[in-house]
């Protein structure tokens, strides 16, 4: 083949001229205008090819890429040359499939180049073989292996001809770069969509827990009033005992927190759990712990709607949660025009953000006025060791002690609060001050961590890291040894252990404190 040249001869004869494997000479039925247009198109193609070859920026990128590739060991990829004798002897069926996938990539490159150079016959041949390869890849027939090998041979022959006719380094490189960009864009869109679905699913209550809650609610309302009282009420205000504050509307998660704490306590009789929920879950939460009391420990269940002092005139956040503007901001994310715009704001559309339960942590001294110290725990933690030493830690005049040694940033999950220092520093009033400033959500959108970081600024004392380990709800790479030596592990993140999205290797640390033989849990088919 002669590239972009003219063969001299008799002017009366048809003189073929080839460019990238495509004949652009005069045909018998060509008019002078058609021949001129064809010649112009070919000149434009050659001009574009020269531009690509002279593009310094592309040359620099390719040079850098080749330099990086020298340090990459390509031996694990093997040799996919099908015409070598050792290929059939040493390669597995999986290797043939990998070769097929490589061929598909190159076939798409040459198919595009064939169409670009107007070589429609080769373009159609490649597309036909691509369809055949795709069908073989999805096939599960018994004789699939032999047919795959035959298809690979056929495609290899077509690619060899395509390489001979169409190959030009710059054009192939740019085609591969364009394909890579397309794949990266598709991958980014898929990741956005996955993030959207993950956030959406993480905010929904699993059917099994909803079933459990409904059954417990029914049983509670059928229970006679005298049988609804918890024992050992005299321990609720005893400052010499170890008190826990747990605010939750998830009965199963709350049960794991209580069970894990009691089972790892040296003296369970000295531990008191103050559980606050809402009126919708009060019956279920009460019934569960009436049926499954935490051994010798004390437990008390309340609903925050019974706190008469907690009203919109006292609490700025309660007034804001009830406002039309807040509800509009919260619910408008459901009407996003696209997945991309919806996923950006979906994190704010979390039911707990519209629940006062999420903000009760700022009113702990008002809820428990006679206590001096209390350990606040979230419902997505598991306790693995005895926590009684936390009450003997000197907070050095600070309001709370948390796990992170950097006072400028910390997290909820487990915090020991000195309620006397809390009152002395007017923490609740400080919280109200910042909530009023954020009425229009200019400082932060929703949630309790931002106001918590501001309110407790410079009023925290660090704990040793062994007490609290974060990340089991999103980080799949946590060292098992770190998990096992931590006193409290925290499933913060979207992948909660009671959902199907939970990270499987971390779920046993949570499920070991769940009684799957309980008739209600068994009937509701949790984790089936």
Curated annotation (Swiss-Prot):
Biological pathway: Glycan metabolism; pectin biosynthesis
GO process annotations (BP): cell wall organization; pectin biosynthetic process
EC number: 2.4.1.-
Miscellaneous information on this protein: Expression not detected in roots, inflorescences, siliques, leaves or stems. The signal-anchor present in all the other members of the family is missing.
Annotated function: May be involved in pectin and/or xylans biosynthesis in cell walls.
Protein name: Putative galacturonosyltransferase 2
Keyword tags: Cell wall biogenesis/degradation, Glycosyltransferase, Transferase
Organism: Arabidopsis thaliana
Matching Pfam families: Glyco_transf_8
Molecular function GO terms recorded: polygalacturonate 4-alpha-galacturonosyltransferase activity
Top-rank taxon: Eukaryota
Record gene name: GAUT2
Family of the protein in this entry: Belongs to the glycosyltransferase 8 family.
Lineage, opening ranks: Eukaryota, Viridiplantae, Streptophyta, Embryophyta, Tracheophyta
């Amino acid at each position: 083949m002669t590239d972009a040249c003219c063969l001299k001869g008799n002017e009366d004869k048809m003189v073929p001229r080839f460019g990238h494997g495509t004949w652009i000479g005069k045909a018998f039925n060509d008019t002078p205008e058609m021949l001129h247009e064809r010649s112009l198109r070919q000149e434009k193609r050659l001009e574009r090819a020269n531009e690509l070859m002279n593009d310094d920026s592309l040359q620099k990128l390719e040079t850098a890429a080749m330099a990086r590739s020298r340090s990459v060991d390509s031996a694990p990829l093997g040799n996919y040359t099908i015409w070598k004798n050792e290929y059939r002897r040493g390669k597995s069926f999986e290797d043939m499939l990998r070769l097929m996938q490589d061929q598909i990539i190159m076939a798409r490159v040459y198919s595009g180049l064939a169409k670009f150079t107007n070589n429609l016959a080769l373009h159609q041949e490649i597309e036909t073989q691509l369809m055949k390869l795709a069908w073989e890849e999805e096939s599960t027939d018994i004789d699939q292996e032999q047919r795959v090998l035959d298809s690979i041979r056929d495609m290899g022959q077509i690619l060899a001809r395509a390489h001979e006719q169409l190959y030009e380094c710059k054009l192939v490189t740019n085609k591969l770069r364009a394909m890579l960009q397309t794949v990266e864009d598709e991958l980014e869109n898929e990741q956005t969509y996955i993030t959207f679905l993950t956030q959406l699913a993480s905010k929904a209550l699993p059917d099994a827990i909803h079933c459990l809650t409904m059954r417990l609610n029914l049983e509670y309302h059928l229970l006679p009033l005298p049988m609804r009282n918890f024992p050992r009420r005299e321990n609720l205000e005893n400052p010499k005992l170890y008190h826990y504050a747990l605010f939750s509307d998830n009965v199963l998660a709350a049960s794991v927190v209580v069970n894990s704490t009691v089972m790892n306590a040296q003296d369970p009789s000295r531990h008191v759990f103050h559980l606050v929920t809402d009126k919708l879950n009060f019956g279920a939460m009460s019934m569960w712990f009436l049926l499954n009391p935490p051994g010798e420990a004390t437990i008390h269940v309340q609903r925050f709607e019974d706190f008469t002092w907690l009203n919109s005139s006292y609490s700025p956040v309660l007034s804001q949660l009830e406002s039309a503007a807040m509800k509009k901001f919260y619910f408008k994310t459901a009407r996003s025009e696209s997945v991309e715009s919806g996923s950006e704001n979906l994190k704010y559309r979390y039911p707990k953000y519209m629940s006062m339960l999420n903000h009760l942590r700022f009113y702990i001294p008002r809820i428990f006025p006679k206590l001096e110290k209390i350990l606040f725990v979230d419902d997505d933690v598991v306790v693995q060791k005895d926590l009684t030493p936390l009450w003997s830690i000197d907070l050095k005049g600070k309001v709370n002690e948390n796990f992170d040694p950097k006072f400028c940033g910390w997290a909820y999950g487990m915090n020991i609060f000195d309620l006397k220092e809390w009152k002395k520093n007017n923490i609740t009033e400080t919280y109200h001050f910042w909530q009023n400033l954020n009425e229009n959500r200019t400082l932060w959108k929703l949630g309790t961590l931002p106001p918590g970081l501001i309110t407790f600024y410079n009023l925290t004392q660090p704990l040793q890291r062994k007490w609290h380990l974060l990340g089991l709800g999103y980080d799949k790479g946590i060292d098992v040894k770190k998990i096992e030596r931590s006193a409290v592990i925290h499933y913060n993140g979207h992948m909660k252990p009671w959902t199907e999205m939970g990270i499987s290797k971390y779920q046993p640390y949570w499920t070991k404190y769940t009684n799957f033989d309980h008739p209600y849990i068994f009937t509701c088919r949790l984790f089936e």
